[in-house]
Amino acid sequence: MAANVGSMFQYWKRFDLQQLQRELDATATVLANRQDESEQSRKRLIEQSREFKKNTPEDLRKQVAPLLKSFQGEIDALSKRSKEAEAAFLNVYKRLIDVPDPVPALDLGQQLQLKVQRLHDIETENQKLRETLEEYNKEFAEVKNQEVTIKALKEKIREYEQTLKNQAETIALEKEQKLQNDFAEKERKLQETQMSTTSKLEEAEHKVQSLQTALEKTRTELFDLKTKYDEETTAKADEIEMIMTDLERANQRAEVAQREAETLREQLSSANHSLQLASQIQKAPDVEQAIEVLTRSSLEVELAAKEREIAQLVEDVQRLQASLTKLRENSASQISQLEQQLSAKNSTLKQLEEKLKGQADYEEVKKELNILKSMEFAPSEGAGTQDAAKPLEVLLLEKNRSLQSENAALRISNSDLSGRCAELQVRITEAVATATEQRELIARLEQDLSIIQSIQRPDAEGAAEHRLEKIPEPIKEATALFYGPAAPASGALPEGQVDSLLSIISSQRERFRARNQELEAENRLAQHTLQALQSELDSLRADNIKLFEKIKFLQSYPGRGSGSDDTELRYSSQYEERLDPFSSFSKRERQRKYLSLSPWDKATLSMGRLVLSNKMARTIGFFYTLFLHCLVFLVLYKLAWSESMERDCATFCAKKFADHLHKFHENDNGAAAGDLWQ
């Protein structure tokens, strides 16, 4: 019967009725959709056939009519067959869709069958024990020599004790071996965990060192750029100052030349005036005329030289102004390039500082690793060097495989422990039942002993017979067989016989009491073992939760995908319900760091949390930051435009001044030449 139930359970489990119902449901949905599609296609065919009849001539219709009828008959037959098949499928679907899955009931029936079989075995064993007890009673009733019986019972008790002792030693050795294996396995796991954590710490230290090196390099480059920028700015300022000095000197020289030209004009005007006066003198000597001609010619030559010098100075001023403008433009472009490089370096520096801040929990990770090292065993150096030589991908893959194998081993161990726990429960139940029977037997023996002890030497035959009636029949028969039929039927038991019987029963009671104490000790040991197994089961469950946490961490690594089963889902829920103690430690550390902050830092942190936690605040902060950036860009653009306009205005004014100066000197030269020729 149990085999039939088991085979039926396996058959229905392989049959998977729920999956079949889901497939039938999907097929029914598809059939319904196909029926709708076939109806629509049928309507379209009818409309197309009508249009074909309308649009084709009668001769062609007569020729095509038999073919169309055969096609229509075949399509009708196919439609009829498909409808019958769909009707049969829907009939089967209606009958199977609501059929409950018999797998749970068969599983329950199989479990009940096992329980019934176990109960039958227990009843059989109980019947055997009863038969054994009856045999012992018969042997006790049929025994002629109580000493031989006592010795045989003592031997049996000794054998039982030796057997129980051997069993206890075997169980203790097995338990010790298992604990040693578990301890070695846990030690290996802790060593692997510590080695992986050490490799991760070394990798983090390497990253921090590289980031610090990059930060120092960036700071050095930034300092060099600032120094270069300051040097170039100083050089440009000195150059501009020299050009301005040359420009001022040129302006001074132009002013001096202009003043000399004015003095020469005055001299020329005075010479012209003197010539006019000389022309009025009719009788002037020839020597004076020659002197005046020479003076006039020398003045004209000097004036022409001064004019050329003034033109040269004007050209120098224009050239210096052009070079100054070009130098300013080059300086502005170089300054803008240096500012762009400086902003790029500043942004790089900020990114590196943010990255360094993002990895600021290095000390905390190192502290947690030291805590783990203090909690775990020290790993071997060879394994650590070998793991450190391997890349991170290989280490993670090996760790994932080891964790999966460890998880499978823990599952098997958990199932074994559950089975052993069930067996121990059954043994405890049997031991409790045996102890109850032993207590009842002891109570009966003590009651019989009290009845025997209440027997005293009678004063009359009636009293003796009345008290002998209270003695149980097995004791009477054993006493009669032991002492023989010589005892008078109507007389009292001799004092020696009563004392011997009392000593036998007392020793038997002591043996039963000792046996009862042994059974109680075994019961307590079994309960203690059950508690130890329960605690070990709890620790294994906690280890499974930690293993699930590690598996979840490995699954979160990019490029690693893995499925999940019911066990992982169960441990996932337990993991979500029960947090790791390091998280509380991290919370306490964060709270301590928060309390050690200054009031301004606390206010800034609270404001940042408030802004990040509220959608409206985040939106306002975003638009406010955007507005500030736009305002800064507008101000910078306005400053650049103002400086450009100032440069253009200065260039325009300088050009106008040069044109005006050139035109003014040309006019003055023309006027002076006219006066000279006059």
From Swiss-Prot:
<keyword id="KW-0333">Golgi apparatus</keyword>
<dbReference type="GO" id="GO:0005794">
    <property type="term" value="C:Golgi apparatus"/>
</dbReference>
<keyword id="KW-0175">Coiled coil</keyword>
<feature type="modified residue" description="Phosphoserine">
    <location>
        <position position="586"/>
    </location>
</feature>
<keyword id="KW-1133">Transmembrane helix</keyword>
<dbReference type="InterPro" id="IPR012955">
    <property type="entry name" value="CASP_C"/>
</dbReference>
<dbReference type="GO" id="GO:0000139">
    <property type="term" value="C:Golgi membrane"/>
</dbReference>
<feature type="coiled-coil region">
    <location>
        <begin position="67"/>
        <end position="450"/>
    </location>
</feature>
<comment type="function">
    <text>May be involved in intra-Golgi retrograde transport.</text>
</comment>
<comment type="subunit">
    <text>Homodimer; disulfide-linked. Interacts with GOLGA5.</text>
</comment>
<feature type="transmembrane region" description="Helical; Anchor for type IV membrane protein">
    <location>
        <begin position="620"/>
        <end position="640"/>
    </location>
</feature>
<dbReference type="Pfam" id="PF08172">
    <property type="entry name" value="CASP_C"/>
</dbReference>
<keyword id="KW-0812">Transmembrane</keyword>
<dbReference type="Pfam" id="PF25398">
    <property type="entry name" value="CUX1_N"/>
</dbReference>
<keyword id="KW-0597">Phosphoprotein</keyword>
<keyword id="KW-0472">Membrane</keyword>
<dbReference type="GO" id="GO:0005654">
    <property type="term" value="C:nucleoplasm"/>
</dbReference>
<keyword id="KW-0813">Transport</keyword>
<keyword id="KW-1015">Disulfide bond</keyword>
<dbReference type="GO" id="GO:0006891">
    <property type="term" value="P:intra-Golgi vesicle-mediated transport"/>
</dbReference>
<feature type="topological domain" description="Lumenal">
    <location>
        <begin position="641"/>
        <end position="678"/>
    </location>
</feature>
<comment type="similarity">
    <text>Belongs to the CASP family.</text>
</comment>
<feature type="coiled-coil region">
    <location>
        <begin position="502"/>
        <end position="556"/>
    </location>
</feature>
<protein>
    <recommendedName>
        <fullName>Protein CASP</fullName>
    </recommendedName>
</protein>
<feature type="topological domain" description="Cytoplasmic">
    <location>
        <begin position="1"/>
        <end position="619"/>
    </location>
</feature>
